[in-house]
Regions:
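Solvent-exposed alpha-helices and their adjacent loops that cap or buttress functional pockets
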Residues: 14-16, 55-56, 79
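Iron-sulfur (Fe-S) cluster-binding segments and ferredoxin-like electron-carrier domains
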Residues: 29-50, 74-94, 101
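Small-residue-enriched alpha-helical segments and adjacent helix-cap loops
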Residues: 2, 20-60, 65
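Short, intrinsically disordered low-complexity segments
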Residues: 56-75, 83
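Short glycine/proline-enriched loop/turn "hinge" motifs that connect secondary-structure elements
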Residues: 13-17, 69-71
Length: 122
C-alpha cells in the first residue's frame, strides 16, 4: 500500500512537475564503462549544476544515479527521458552541454548521442 509519506517524498523531489529525467551510470559495484572516481565526479557535477540552475527538485529535472546502464564502454553513460537519448563520455563538459542544450532547450546533443528511442514508440 502506498503511504502518504511516499506521496510527499515524490512531491518533494519534483515528480509532479518533472519534464525530463536523467539517469547517470556511476558508482558502479564493478566499474566497467569508466573508472569509479570519474563517474562520481560526473555525478557530483550534475547534482551541483542542476541545483545552481534551479532545475532540481521543483525545477522540472529529475536525476538518478544508476549502478549500471549496461553500455559498458565510453562512460560515464547517461540517458534522458522522455526522449530516450543515450549519451556517452558524460564528463562535466559534456554534461554541461546536455544540461544547456537538451535539458533546458530540448535539443538532443548529437555529438555525444549513442542512440535514441522514445519509449512507447512515439
Amino acid at each position: 500500500m502506498i503511504t502518504e509519506s511516499q506521496t510527499r517524498a515524490a512531491a518533494s523531489i519534483g515528480v509532479p512537475v518533472a519534464r525530463r529525467h536523467i539517469f547517470l551510470c556511476c558508482d558502479q559495484t564493478t566499474p566497467k564503462c569508466c573508472e569509479k572516481e570519474r563517474g562520481l565526479v560526473a555525478w557530483d557535477f550534475l547534482k551541483k549544476r542542476l541545483k545552481e540552475l534551479g532545475l532540481s527538485d521543483e525545477g522540472g529535472i529529475l536525476r538518478t544515479k544508476a549502478n549500471c546502464l549496461r553500455i559498458c564502454e565510453g562512460g560515464p553513460v547517461a540517458v534522458v527521458y522522455p526522449e530516450g537519448a543515450w549519451y556517452g563520455e558524460c564528463d562535466p563538459p559534456v554534461l554541461e552541454r546536455i544540461i544547456q542544450e537538451h535539458l533546458i532547450e530540448g535539443r538532443v546533443v548529437r555529438e555525444y548521442l549513442i542512440e535514441q528511442h522514445r519509449l512507447g514508440g512515439a
